[in-house]
Amino acid sequence: MKKLLWLDDFRNPSDYVVGDYDISLVKSYAEFCKFITDNGLPDIVCFDHDLGEEKSGYDCAKFLVNYCQEHNLDIPEFDIQSTNSVGKENIRSLMNNWHRVYSTRLLLDKN
């Protein structure tokens, strides 16, 4: 069963997620960071951008990318359920950029 980390201060994952997943719900930047630090990467991360606090889903995505850089890991699968279109695109761009960097490193290391 895939492990899914749901980041959202408002939405309940059971209202949105279809399928058989082991879901962990976190509602803040601090909870997100603690989950990743304690458990490593899940198989899938679902991001909200606006968390109703100082830190946003984008900050969580930056933490995740830094974690991946430090541990030489690719990003997990991800989705973004935020209604904030600018925040959504910022998260998507950050995550996709790290995936491209990681994939390029793998290719260079093989040569």
Question: Which residues make up each language-model segment?
Answer:
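Catalytic phosphate/metal-binding cores of nucleic-acid and nucleotide-processing enzymes, i.e., regions
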Residues: 1-111
